[in-house]
Amino acid sequence: MSKAELKDFTFKSRHIGPTNEDEALMLQHLGYENSEEFISSVIPNEIFDSENNVVSIPDGCDQNKALKEINIISKKNVEHRSLIGLGYHSTVIPPVIQRNVLENPNWYTAYTPYQAEISQGRLEALFNFQTLISELTGLPISNASLLDEATAAAEAISLSLAVRKNKNANKFLVDQEILPQTFDVLKTRCEPLGISLEMFENNNFEIDKNIFGILIQLPGKNGRIWDPTKIINDAHKCNAIVTIAIDPLAQVLIKPMGEFGADIVVGSAQRFGVPIACGGPHAAFFATKEIYKRQIPGRIVGQSVDVEGNQALRLALQTREQHIRRDKATSNICTAQVLLAVLSSFYAVHHGPKGLKQIAENVVKYRSNFESILMNLEYPIEKYSAFDSVDVYCSEASEVIQLASEEGYNFRVLPIGSDFENAKGFGVTFDELTCDEEIYTLHQILAQVKGKKAHDLSNFLNENASLVDIPLREKSWLEQSVFNQYQSETDLMRYIHSLVSKDFSLVQGMIPLGSCTMKLNSAAELLPIEWREFSSIHPFAPHAQLAGFHEIINDLENWLSALTGFQGVSLQPNAGSQGEFAGLLVIRSWHQSLGEGHRNICLIPTSAHGTNPASAVMSGFKVVSVKCDEYGNVDLEDLKNKSKIHSKNLAALMVTYPSTHGVFEPNIREMCQVIHQEGGQVYLDGANLNAQVGICRPGSYGIDVCHLNLHKTFSIPHGGGGPGVGPIAVADHLVPYLPGHSIIKCGGEKAISAVSAAPFGSAGILPISWMYIRMMGSDGLRKASSIAILSANYLAKRLDPYYPVLFKDPNGLVAHECILDLRPLKSQLGIEVEDVAKRLMDYGFHAPTISWPVAGTLMVEPTESESLPELDRFCDAMIGIREEIEQIKLGKIDPINNPLKQSPHTLKRVTSDDWDRPYSRKEAAYPLPDQEKYKFWPSVSRINNAYGDRNLICSCPSVQDLEDINSV
């Protein structure tokens, strides 16, 4: 077999949908002879990297070779049993959940459930998650996940600030037992907003009218628990909002914090069946009172009804969010941790309230038994009530930690952040994996250090240990049927699949969402993240034990630097929104270092992603909008005028490239020069980087800092709305300001404080992007970008006669996505863009992005992974819908009772006995030829969005609630 033939079996050919023959046909359709001629017509000459000199990235390889290489790297991580705690705990993911959810592309390749009619399964799993959190916390409103516990705590400060009664109050107090990584992120959030962040000790503080909120960590970082009633009452006396950061496993036993009077409760659901994975990804949660439902950050799943009166779920209260409210949004959160929330919700379904209680009680028992062992061996310990942890300060600390390490255990080094050689004490945290044998091993270690003999464990094991010094949960909880009827694996497996059968993902077909890059997430890329060498590692483990992770991180930093033309990268931000925040803070710190901290104006085009203005406000900047011209480009004259007007205070320009209008703006280099001449910096939103990789480099045409979405461009799956990774790449002068961390050394010499709880963010999924880049190589990455652009232009050319493409460059071309203008259909026939989106479901497609960045349009992004037949199938669907619209125009179809207005059509409706439509059942359900062979059915009809917001229900009713309802 020739070398040319072998190339067809490389990963590149598996990842890229169109074959070489397909590519030639598409180029011919567009009037080009070869891909280089085509790409040079799309990319402005002044930024086009015609040589593709990314020499630091190895050549692409097949899947087996890459898997062998990363397996060798993984073995460099030392897999010790972690008893470090500090918010990260070993847990068991039930195999039935691992197999049927985590490893199932139906779950991990779906997108955020904006199209609710084809997302009912995922929405139900998230509804269960919200119910779980509400039951744990005793608060009625919970969101569908946040990025990590530290971010959730920071969002609590934002909510507290927004609803404060004394608008001059600027002081927020935090418990001295707060997790150090959480305090780190709180400092980052508070400083740009002028919030005074102070610690209080011994559960006491002075009542002060300038305090607008307090945060209590309960249990504390050392596991301590106590009754927070008094401090909550004291805080409320000065009108302060009370946030409590909880451990969900401890909360299984403890009286819900909402019943103590807490206003907000946050935490991480990691203990509920999600691996530590060197710090993430994990689903955080945020619960609050009913009165704050319109200020809560992140997405909320709410109950509504469809047009036929059937119960349905949807994303509720979206007007709070950044894609609508922009700089006035409650948060900049977009991507969250949906897949991880789904895992945790199924973990709770699997165990039920009895199983969760047993796990929690075992933790309490082993902690109590270990304390007895310490006392027997005469280790000096401070007696206090605690859930899972013990801290010991003693002269033998270094020896204990060293011996434990030799036996395969990692203890917490005290003070936190110290090396074991300088340890003043050690801490141990117990978890779901703790067992009698482990306690005996720890007993032997401690006895050996004291020169004593370990005694029979029966002297210390107390099966009846319980929590004291805090009221416990008395009422029944998690009584909802979903948490009590799926404890057998057969039933749970069937329940999981009953949900996923309601969801549209890449398994069912193309998801052509503009600005979302729904490309292939290959099986080979995902395999390593489940290996214990990656999944079991604690982020605060000794540096030498993380050699494999450091190699992955270093490779990615170098590769991403080379691909973007920058000199430094931080992988810490765990979503694009946090990348924006981090990048803007880096710019802010650089200005401050020059004595120009007064620079606070951020110019943002009106077409920008909603996260841009929201992130700018969070970073302490004032947003000034820049107009766009009729061609979708940033209005260069308006940019120059605004830059001049705000010259003394200009901090930055935030720009997306290619633009959110789907074109490569020819003046990008000049735009950068305009900003630099006035002393500002240029921030690039990397949401559209999939059109640039290997073709042009932002660092080479004037950009100073850029965030990248590894969950878009570099193949990490969207997971139905997370996880994500949003690293930032920066020019040389900004490298010293890359984010640091209070426990693990990272970042620049003048680092801003952390933007995520873990030093390397969601490190557990970085192997996915490592595999993608390693297998694609520089040529493959360039090819992927080229095909992504080609596919978008092919769609644009085919669909332009039916739906005008709104923005094109001077050559009549688009970038990697295009905007289809449906506005004339509304003005002429009353056909809404939503009608077309819902009708696409009947044709077997997820809709493109709706009404953004221009109302009444569809933004289509096919990516490089979709084959030519799939692209044609989508075009046929859109053309078929246009023909249906033409029938309405000609008066052959009723303007209201037609396939578009009545879409989507469910199996239940199509097979009902009372079909009363003037069109046939076949026209409703099988509009494309051969659809009878395979059909994805929406599980509900069109949902009433307004009803859901007016009647907000975001958790399952309890048995008592149902009884109360039925008695009315």
From Swiss-Prot:
The catalysed reaction is: N(6)-[(R)-lipoyl]-L-lysyl-[glycine-cleavage complex H protein] + glycine + H(+) = N(6)-[(R)-S(8)-aminomethyldihydrolipoyl]-L-lysyl-[glycine-cleavage complex H protein] + CO2
Cofactor(s) needed, names only, are: pyridoxal 5'-phosphate
InterPro entries named among the record's database cross-references: GcvP, GDC-P_C, GDC-P_N, GDC_P, PyrdxlP-dep_Trfase, PyrdxlP-dep_Trfase_major, PyrdxlP-dep_Trfase_small
Q: Give the top-rank taxon of the lineage listed in the UniProt record for this protein.
A: Bacteria
Q: Which SUPFAM superfamilies match?
A: PLP-dependent transferases (SSF53383)
Query: Can you quote a single GO CC term?
Result: cytosol
Q: Give the sites modified to N6-(pyridoxal phosphate)lysine.
A: K712
Give a yes or no for keyword Lipid metabolism in this entry: no
Which Pfam families did the record assign? GcvP2_C, GDC-P
One GO term under biological process is: glycine decarboxylation via glycine cleavage system
Report keywords, A-Z: Oxidoreductase, Pyridoxal phosphate
| EC numbers, comma separated | 1.4.4.2
The molecular function GO annotations come to:
glycine binding; glycine dehydrogenase (decarboxylating) activity; pyridoxal phosphate binding
Q: What class of enzyme is it?
A: oxidoreductase
Instruction: Supply the NCBIfam families for this chain.
Output: gcvP, PRK04366.1
Q: How does it assemble?
A: The glycine cleavage system is composed of four proteins: P, T, L and H.
Looking up HAMAP family in the UniProt record yields: GcvP
Task performed by this protein = The glycine cleavage system catalyzes the degradation of glycine. The P protein binds the alpha-amino group of glycine through its pyridoxal phosphate cofactor; CO(2) is released and the remaining methylamine moiety is then transferred to the lipoamide cofactor of the H protein.
- Family per UniProt? Belongs to the GcvP family.
Please report the name of this protein according to its UniProt entry.
Glycine dehydrogenase (decarboxylating)
Gene that produces this protein: gcvP
